[in-house]
Amino acid sequence: VALGYKYRLSIVVFFLSFTYIELMDKTTYLNHYYFISLVSFLLVFLPAHRNFSLDVSRGVVTSTSKIQVIYINVIKLQLGIVYFFAGIAKINYVWIFNAQPLKLWLSSKVHLPIIGWVLRYKVTAYIFSWFGMLFDTTIPFFLAFKRTMPYAYIVVVIFHLTTGVLFPIGVFQLVMILGTTIFFPASFHEKVINRLSNLFRYSRRISVLGNAPKTHMIFFVAFFCVQVLIPLRYLMMPGNVFWSEQGYRFSWRVMLMEKAGDITFFIQDGDRKHMVANYEYLTPQQEKMMSTQPDMILQFVRFLEKEFKAKGFEDPKITARS
């Protein structure tokens, strides 16, 4: 995909394979995996191979110096949705007024050199909580304006490097630091392409891409309507989203809570009793996540019911101790 070799086929294969692996086990769900799936899906429709690619070198497509702004803006909008809804999710009593879970997390990082002593103070957790909320809700807008964009990007880099040191959560920080360069002016990207072209002695045949198909425009509008509605679906569901977790996933609720627990299941059918060893059915990661998430507990109980009926239990009653 990065080299632009058989781009359309490559990005479709990447999107399908990455998303399949991501969705195969819900206990491995991470917001940045979901983000990568969404961006790779959008890239299926974008002419990302029309400049500085092997497809251009092979003559499969002609190089273009300009594309429609809609193809740039869809990536900007997707990034903005991630940040904005992550910030909106932080506007809750526990995050704002209790500084949790940051108070808990930061207290475990006091051993770090240079910054560890600052993390000892309770006020630090409140500063981090408020800044994190304000950063997420406002940074897309500061990045979108030319005057504030350079300063906003510096804040993006500092923010994600800091969170990367304190909370290493995989590739998320790197993805966001690199991804937000899409807000840079076109002249910056042109300079980068020109220097790389000279370095690799890459010759470009320049043309201008035509208008974006109306079908693309309609699709993007529908796509982002769904992207806005999905994070809000919890409003239509009963109960507290932090307890039930209904509507929690796919909603950009990034690092909002800390849960830990254990649960043991008991099967009874008349005089027959059995205590379930969770590890016989689940990996350590699956058992850890299942123990604290209601929908996974219910799913595992339904699995156990089928499992023990297959073993001869006629009417298994399943209870839990947690």
PLM region spans:
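Alpha-helical transmembrane segments of multi-pass integral membrane proteins
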Residues: 35, 39-46, 67-92, 219-227
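Aromatic-anchored segments of alpha-helical transmembrane domains
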Residues: 15-25, 86, 157-169, 182-185, ...
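Membrane-interfacial catalytic/cofactor-binding modules of polytopic membrane enzymes
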Residues: 76-135
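Membrane-water interface signatures at transmembrane helix termini and the short loops
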Residues: 124-186, 243
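Membrane-interface helix caps and helix-loop-helix hairpins in membrane proteins
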Residues: 23-33, 120-123, 163-172
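Extracytosolic and intramembrane catalytic regions of membrane-associated proteins
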Residues: 245-322
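Membrane-interfacial, low-structure loops and terminal tails that flank and connect transmembrane helices
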Residues: 53-71, 190-213
